[in-house]
UniProtKB/Swiss-Prot annotation:
Domain F-box: 9-57
Keywords: Leucine-rich repeat, Repeat
Keyword field contains Repeat: yes
Superkingdom field: Eukaryota
InterPro entries reported in the protein's UniProt record: F-box-like_dom_sf (IPR036047), F-box_AtFBL13-like (IPR053781), F-box_dom (IPR001810), FBD (IPR006566), FBL60-like (IPR055294), LRR_FXL15/At3g58940/PEG3-like (IPR055411)
Lineage summary: Eukaryota, Viridiplantae, Streptophyta, Embryophyta, Tracheophyta
Name used for this protein in its record: F-box/LRR-repeat protein At1g48400
LRR repeats: 71-97, 125-153, 174-199, 225-251, 327-358, 359-384
CDD domains on file: F-box_AtFBL13-like
Amino acid sequence: MAMMRTSPRDSISNLPDEILGKILSLLPTKVAASTSVLSKRWRNLLGLVDNLCFDESMVVYPNEEEETSGSLRFCDFVDKTFALLSNSHIKKFSLSRVYKYNDDVDGMVRRWIRTVMERGLLEIHLHATPMSFVAIETKLLTSNTLVKLTLSARCFVEVERVFFPALKSLSLFSILGDYTNYIRLIDGCPVLEELYMRDGDYPFLRLTCGTNVESASLKRLVIFTHNPNEMIWHELIYFEAPSLVYLDYSSYVSAKYDVVDFDLLVEARLSLRLWVSTNDYDYSDDDDDDDDDDDDDDDGDYYIVEPKAPIFGDVTELLAAIRNITTLHLSPDSLEVFHFCCKSMPVFNNLLNLSIESNKDKGWQVMPLLLKSCPNLHTLVIKGLVHRVTSRCGDACACIPKKQRKIVQKEEALCCLRTCQVKVLQISEYGGYFQELKQMRHFLGKLECLETVKVGVHAENNNNSEFLRANVLTLPRVSAKCNVHFI
């Protein structure tokens, strides 16, 4: 019997124009425009696109001459696209410039921005690489409809007046502009709810974003600043955001934090870094004598220990301001900052979830005090158990120097883990090394309220997962309710 032949059907072309317009709006505009050559059916659908995304990085030029002429062709394509769209409503406009700055091209960019602003724009995203440049005019910073604005890299902002009455989300990533213009920009967004900032990528410029945040409406704040060469710009950090519920803050530690009203804050993610190494401030003393000097055990020589310079930074007020949170995430550096730069640890009565990340070069000195300051902690999440052994790791850690073991045995009943209310312990990137297994034994043998332990094996040790599992499952558990699961 002859096989029945079926002709392929173009089912997507049978969809209504409105749906095809939505589909094309999800594609890069260059790809969407190329569909016009498919058939007559697709020829006029570009006019239904309400999301324009122009990315010059998608174009690769073989040499500098082609780069110059090619960049102009890219601009010509953008101009023709706007001409085809006529007076169509535009919801979102994204532009990424890559190639060299040119006065004519800069004028075109300003014209494109004005055009989309006049068409009820909801979102605009502008990015310029170090080779290019986008100057933001004052008249471009006024819109009654814009709800989301992103300015990235070499976008230069110099404004006299800003008014975005509907703007809910603002992202500023390493923009060019001084502190005054930054403040004007924030002040011109009366209903702003989300603010994302990155600063410090230009070491020759003063930090503008992230040193001062004042917004009555702000609910979500993400700050990343990185300028390890300019301690002077970290004398004072000021936050006033009474509606804030989420904070993600990454920066070198500052001399002082002035925080006004973080009472509604629920979750904080902190990655604070010290300006100097702490290797000379905390060390392990592994001998069995009663002194704190490792060197004098070898030859009886006498060493004069010079006093250490105080470490720059004070996070006392910052921690006091976030004491009502329920979830806290800490980087390895933050643990050291808490230890060296906090004069008085607040009590986190509402903290239910604590997540920390370990690093073999960073210590756990603050862990005993931190755990004692979280009386109602329910879930403890630790990414990696390997950390730097110091003379002050305390009873939260199994890596106790030999000299202190007798003292620790006498104070066993006072161990911070025995009074800890943690019911869920989650360990990720577990490698099964001797130090890690000791730490697991320490947790399982001291956390009396523990009910669930979740262990995720490091990808490098997947081949030994059964062996690692067996080692952990045989460890003694002080809690009769404790169940161990490998995830």
